[in-house]
From Swiss-Prot:
Family annotation (Pfam families): Ribosomal_L17
Quaternary structure (record): Part of the 50S ribosomal subunit. Contacts protein L32.
A GO BP entry: translation
Protein name: Large ribosomal subunit protein bL17
Keyword terms, alphabetized: Ribonucleoprotein, Ribosomal protein
Lineage of source species: Bacteria, Pseudomonadati, Pseudomonadota, Gammaproteobacteria, Pseudomonadales
Organism expressing this protein natively: Stutzerimonas stutzeri (strain A1501)
Gene that encodes it: rplQ
HAMAP family found in the cross-reference section: Ribosomal_bL17 (MF_01368)
GO molecular function: structural constituent of ribosome
InterPro entries reported in the protein's UniProt record: Ribosomal_bL17, Ribosomal_bL17_CS, Ribosomal_bL17_sf
PROSITE patterns attached to this UniProt entry: RIBOSOMAL_L17
Family statement: Belongs to the bacterial ribosomal protein bL17 family.
Recorded GO CC terms: cytosolic large ribosomal subunit
UniProt keyword annotation of RNA-binding present: no
Tree of life domain: Bacteria
Length: 129
């Protein structure tokens, strides 16, 4: 029986799952918008949102924890220098999952995962001027 077991297996070993979500989180922090399958998107929330919450308080210990979970210096830098400050007043819900149809090959439900309050291309150009 699988009573009170949380999380999705996604037909992968635990090491593969850990590496996959680590890579997806780094990609999300770098690009602020990624496209993936709906179950992966829902599970990515459980990995990425605690990292953003951790980044709201900048300390050496928190940076080391974030690096341990992402293994990417660039992602940790962006988390603490940009995203932590951006979401300092937000209590949670840093990600938005938007359904975007089905994949052509296997009809898998697809979704966009994006950071809430991310700057849109038009706003970035206007702010630069």
């Amino acid at each position: 029986m699988r009573h009170r077991k949380s999380g999705r297996h996604l037909s992968r070993t635990s090491a593969h799952r850990k590496a996959m979500f680590q890579n997806m989180a780094v990609s999300l922090f770098e690009h602020e918008l990624i496209k993936t399958t709906l179950p992966k998107a829902k599970e990515l929330r459980r990995v990425a949102e605690p990292l953003i919450t951790l980044a709201k308080e900048d300390s050496v210990a928190n940076r080391r924890l974030a690096f341990d979970r992402t293994r990417s210096k660039a992602a940790v830098g962006k988390l603490f220098n940009d995203l932590g400050k951006r979401y300092a007043t937000r209590q949670g819900g840093y990600l938005r999952i938007l359904k975007c149809g089905f994949r052509a090959g296997d009809n898998a439900p697809m979704a966009y995962v994006e950071l809430v309050d991310r700057p849109v291309a038009g706003e970035v150009e206007a702010a630069a001027e």
